[in-house]
Amino acid sequence: LSYTYRHSDRLFNGQSGVANPNNISTTFHRISLNGQFRFSDELTLSAFVPWLEGGRKERGTTDRRLSGLGDVTLLAQWSPWAGDAEAQPLLSGLSLLGGIELPTGEDNDQPFTGNAAPSLFQLGNGTFNPKLGFSYGKAIDKSSYFGRVVATIPIGESDADLDSGSYLQASVGTGYRLTDALTLQLSVDGTFRERDQLNNVDVSNTGSVSLSVTPAVSWRVNDKLAVDASASIPFFHDVRSTQVAPGTSFQLGARFNF
């Protein structure tokens, strides 16, 4: 179970911040119920069910709201060498990822294309979105190292003729176990988005590159419960046209083992 908060109020054009005289901003709250089942050392299946609350403001007045179920994601992780770590010490940390994002979130009949992040302000994009990628993790004594790359490739168009752009998410980081219960992590994360299309025409204020640094802490309360906290702090934006760039996001989570 996790909760994420993000407030965004900085306008960018390309890599430069620009004036925001109308005080355009967006605020998002997301509660996500996540489940994971391990069939074996090699195969794990995960599900992510998000609930979203959001609003867009201009000149101090909320002109757009979101509330409801977002797009549910199913993801399989296959680690072919996980059960043979002694014979394959380097490959044992490699996992292949594959899954799909389901169109469970409501998509708008007339998607909003104003200066907002995301540019098309809706709970879901109305298409099936396959996901492919890989991850790698390695622990050495009290230190750990990890990386992850996942591409999302929407198929087809929504009922409103919205063709969402593909995007790539990448992360690389390290962790250090201070005690048996307390671990600190630091990662650099990137999101690379192609432009969306509406009625077969590029939406000008879509498509971007965002980089952020994410410090995180994990506390294992006992064998059944762990608590996590993190903050994702953007340090680089490169957007097409003028957009509200994503602001800092804060996340709190709890993990239960059954």
Explain the meaning of each model-derived region:
Residues 27-31, 66-72, 92, 126-130, ...:
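Residues that define the transmembrane beta-barrel architecture of outer-membrane proteins
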Residues 3, 37, 49, 78-80, ...:
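Residue-level signature of outer-membrane beta-barrel architecture
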Residues 10-21, 161-258:
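Outer membrane beta-barrel transmembrane domains
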Residues 42, 81-93, 142, 181, ...:
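Short loop/turn motifs that connect adjacent beta-strands in outer-membrane beta-barrel proteins
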Residues 1, 45-47, 74, 92-98, ...:
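Transmembrane beta-strands of outer-membrane beta-barrel proteins
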Residues 6-12, 54-58, 83, 101-107, ...:
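Sequence/structural signature of outer-membrane beta-barrel proteins
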Residues 23-75, 79:
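Long, hydrophobic/aromatic-enriched structural stretches that serve as scaffold segments
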